[in-house]
Amino acid sequence: MNSRIFSQIKSWIYIICIAATFSSCTQGVFDYEHPDVEIFVNQLKSGKLAIQGTDQAGYMPKFTTDDIETLLKYADDLSEIPAFPLAPVSYSAGGKLRLGECLLWTIESIRLGHNASMGCKMVHVDAEDYEGIYFLSDEEVLDAVQRYRNWWEGRKYPRTMWTIDPCFDEPLCGSNYMWW
């Protein structure tokens, strides 16, 4: 009797282990065609995002406007990340890659319908060139995050013929920032 119970317990433990193995493998898989923001952010932070593309030039996941609110949730995290899915030429100007700034770039790319710029770096509007000295400070990036949040919140309310707001669809309007 005891060996029969022990055998059944062993069978159940085996089934549970197999099920746990398969479910844990699928949770961390990132699908570029149907991306999940949480998985994207976690893999960027851990450096485990598999960049897809040819010749080491990555391409962006197919995020949509439905993802903007979730992307904004993580945008104030200025953790340094090792890589971001853009062509390597984008990093030639140097400077650290900050998660939040790259997520804002992703949002801007969704807004425009194409890549916002050559890289996920913002510079001052009056920058003479794209050297690192013109990149935004952490405080300025956080200001840009708030501007994007205000823009997104404002987009929830319909624009009418009486709306007089030149910055209605320009998150960085009125700031001294632009995409590199």
What are these regions (language model features)?
Residues 28, 32-36, 45, 79-180:
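Long, helix-rich interaction regions
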Residues 59-63, 94-97:
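Electron-transfer interface patches adjacent to heme c in soluble/periplasmic c-type cytochromes
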Residues 55-56, 103:
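Conserved hydrophobic register position within alpha-solenoid helical repeats
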Residues 62-63, 74, 110-114:
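Residue-level signature of the C-terminal ends
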Residues 23-24:
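C-terminal motif of bacterial Sec signal peptides marking the signal peptidase cleavage site
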Residues 40, 67-75:
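Buried hydrophobic core positions in alpha-solenoid tandem helical repeats
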Residues 2-13:
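Bacterial N-terminal signal peptides that target proteins for export
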Residues 50-53, 68, 96, 100:
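Residue-level detector of extended alpha-helical repeat arrays and alpha-solenoid scaffolds
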